[in-house]
Regions:
Chain A
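Periplasmic-binding protein-like
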Residues: 96-109, 129-131, 170-175, 224-234, ...
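Short beta-strand segments enriched in small/hydrophobic residues
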Residues: 34-52, 108, 170-176
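Beta-alpha junction/loop-to-helix N-cap segments that form part of ligand/metal-binding clefts
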Residues: 28, 35, 49-58, 67-138, ...
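Extracellular/periplasmic periplasmic-binding protein-like sensory domains
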Residues: 244-314, 385-391
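Extracellular/periplasmic Venus flytrap/periplasmic-binding protein
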Residues: 136, 143-248, 284-293
């Protein structure tokens, strides 16, 4: 009997990663009021479709429920759509909190949800394990801790990479500024300058979302940039590299953030000779390896496409499942908050940093990226190691 | 100074695009009396039909004509909507209808073309023609300009010298009277729409590889295009042509100047404002006197 119990415990820890939580293995979460309610607010319809994020989270919960739940407790997961509209985002969050009585949020991927709802989460004492945080508030609120690195930390990391590993001297950065992101990108550049003791050669915050990029590329070339970092999204990456080719620009490393990391971008640029690099949020999703193994298995079982966004949803769901599993007693907003704010590091193979929520006033736990290079219409990992930034002071 | 020249030349490729779309906007307004907000979206639809065929392995010799035909078809469809329900409506109502159609077309287009996911646009004309002030002037931007110039000249001659041209002018000035004297108003109007659709589709196919390759960005090219048309007061093809080029060049210069570059997006609006003030100056001064 004793053998059987320990066997069960071992398998439980193995499957749910309880050991990594450092929590007591005998924890037994209970749910007297029915299934545990979780939810997320994501941009699903509207200007972009980030539904892969929450769908990835849902796949984790569905498969957990099918296997009997956590200590018999199943999870009911509500995916709300903010349509890229702040008002809808606010309503969606209130609906999840007041009507659905969610105990926590997680796995959401939205353009603006953090900025709109951080205050609501604070007032209602509910925490959010954001799947893909985009707006600066995702990384600057006490109630939100995303599982992704985010564009700002990635900016710092990629500048550092360009300077240290690609040996570029004159680094230039061109940013598209949407909403209140200017300050966050400026901070990201400053952080790199403080870290490296170097100064950036040129910063241009006026890159247009739509429009011709030729004048900007000419400016970069004529200013003598060795590397150009931008926060372009998918179509912009393609446009930029095509324009660089049309202008026969040579000798500039083009550096992008995770927003350019899709197979569509790689396929649209099969013949370019420009050196193109970018930093990923997690283990590169295009690679089949052990680190991606569990995520891939979950996605395949759910019949979902394997995208970077689904990694975010998956990882956030894992964090929530492991947090709930470590609770001894009823699963409520309070108990989840207590567990998350303990700030114990949680380790997952698809991320380069340990995930920590903790009780700080703002959170950006993920500080590691893997660098990919475009080669023959494919993204190829440049290194197998994580490129990790030193902790923020 | 040299860098300013480089920025100006760099603005040429955008200018060519604005010019052809601006000329098409004047064309639509003069002949069917519609301020057409869907101009670029029609072209985007045709372009994406071409890209879809190209991506599924068809050669360009099939893809390009099919795309042009698709653009003409979408434009004809909009023409049918306009002539069936809004033939007698005021110009502002018609403009509002096309603005509403634009929103609809973008929404549907984004869904059908996979949202922001980029497509691999084949370059119909590759390479650069020459290098000027350190900037490669691409064959594509020269071709766009050429299309704009040829379209302007041909249309002017056609309207001035042919019988159909005369009928078209009658149609736009007094549609009711034209109908009464036996001109086949509806057929002519639909032909105008089809021509606009075909021309913008081809122009956008040439422009697209160097623009942000998604449906919305291409559709929104209509904003600077309408500014260009306004410079021609929606009547002069040549003024719209030059206006489009000027907007492109001013945008290029502005992005080379740090102080101005963040207001670059506002340039079409500033141009519209300046033109309105200038064109209304007579009325204002007369009143003051």
């Amino acid at each position: 009997m004793k053998y059987l119990t320990s066997l069960l415990l071992t398998s439980a820890t193995a499957c749910c990663g309880l050991a990594l939580m450092g929590g007591s293995a005998a924890a037994a979460p209970t749910c007297e009021d029915g299934p545990i309610q979780l939810g997320s607010v994501s941009t699903i319809t509207g200007p972009v479709d980030f539904s892969d994020g929450p769908s990835g989270a849902k796949a984790v919960f569905d498969q957990l429920n099918a296997a009997g739940g956590i200590n018999g407790c199943t999870i009911e997961y509500t995916m709300a759509d903010d349509k890229g509209d702040p008002q809808v985002a606010a309503q969606a969050a209130r609906d999840l909190i007041d009507n659905r009585n969610v105990v926590a949020l997680g796995g959401g991927a939205s353009l603006l949800e953090c900025a709109v709802n951080a205050g609501t989460y604070k007032r209602n004492d509910v925490l959010s394990v954001q799947g893909v945080g985009v707006d600066p508030m995702c990384f600057n609120a006490p109630t939100i801790a995303p599982v992704n690195v985010g564009p700002y930390t990635l900016t710092t990391a990629m500048l550092d990479y360009a300077s240290n590993e690609l040996k570029n001297e004159k680094l230039c950065a061109f940013f598209i500024i949407l909403g209140g992101t200017q300050e966050a990108y400026a901070q990201a550049v400053k952080r790199w300058e403080a870290m490296s003791g170097k100064t950036i050669h040129l910063v241009d915050m006026t890159l247009p979302l739509q429009g011709d990029l030729t004048p900007y590329l000419i400016k970069a070339r004529d200013s003598g940039c060795d590397a150009v970092l931008t926060n372009q999204v998918e179509p912009g990456v393609v446009q930029m590299i095509n324009t660089a080719d049309a202008q026969k620009i040579e000798g500039i490393d083009w550096i992008f953030l995770a927003s350019g990391y899709t197979e569509g971008v790689a396929k649209a640029l099969p013949d370019t000779r420009q050196p193109v690099y970018l930093g990923t949020e997690w283990e590169p999703y295009t690679e089949v390896n052990a680190a991606n193994g569990d995520w891939m298995a979950v996605m395949e079982k759910a019949g979902l496409a394997k995208t970077a966004f689904s990694q975010g949803g998956y990882l956030a769901a894992k964090v929530l499942v492991d947090t709930i599993s470590s609770i001894d007693g009823p699963v409520t907003r309070e108990t989840i908050k207590a567990k998350l704010t303990e700030g114990k590091p949680m380790k997952y193979s698809i991320a380069g940093s340990d995930y920590v929520f903790g009780d700080a006033a703002k959170h950006a736990p993920m500080q590691a990226t893997k660098v990919m290079q475009l080669s023959g219409g494919k993204w190829v990992p440049r290194t197998t190691d994580w490129y990790v930034l030193p902790p923020v002071e | 100074m040299n860098s300013l020249l480089a920025s100006a030349v760099a603005g040429l490729s955008a200018g060519g695009a604005y010019a052809i779309l601006g000329v098409c906007a004047v064309f639509t307004y003069r002949l069917v009396a519609v301020v057409n907000f869907t101009g670029a979206a029609i072209g985007a639809a045709g372009t994406f039909v071409m890209v879809t065929l190209y991506e599924s392995g068809y050669p360009l010799a099939i893809g390009v004509p099919a795309g042009i035909a698709a653009g003409a078809l979408v434009a004809t469809w909009i023409g049918i909507v306009m002539t069936t329900w809004f033939a007698g409506a005021s110009a502002s109502t018609k403009a509002a209808v096309t603005a509403a159609l634009l929103v609809g077309i973008i929404a549907v287009g984004l869904r059908l073309t996979g949202g922001q996911h980029p497509h691999s646009f084949p370059e119909l004309v590759t390479g650069s023609a020459f290098r000027f002030a350190g900037v490669e002037v691409t064959r594509a931007s020269l071709l766009t300009l050429a299309i704009a110039v040829v379209f302007t000249l041909v249309t002017e001659q056609f309207l001035a010298r042919t019988r159909t041209g005369l009928q078209l002018r009658a149609l736009s000035l007094r549609p009711m009277a034209a109908e009464l004297i036996g001109i086949r108003v509806r057929l002519l109007a639909l032909c105008v729409w089809a021509v606009v659709g075909a021309v913008t589709s081809f122009a956008l196919m040439v422009i697209a590889p160097l623009r942000s390759p998604d449906f919305m960005s291409l559709s929104l090219l209509v904003v600077p295009a309408l500014a260009a048309a306004l410079i021609g007061a929606f009547t002069s093809f040549r003024a719209a042509l030059i206006g489009g080029l000027m907007i492109g060049i001013i945008e290029g210069v502005a992005s080379g100047l740090d102080t101005f570059s963040q207001y670059r997006g506002a340039i079409p609006f500033l141009v519209i404002l300046a033109v309105l003030l200038w064109s209304q100056r007579g009325a204002r001064w007369d009143e003051a006197r």
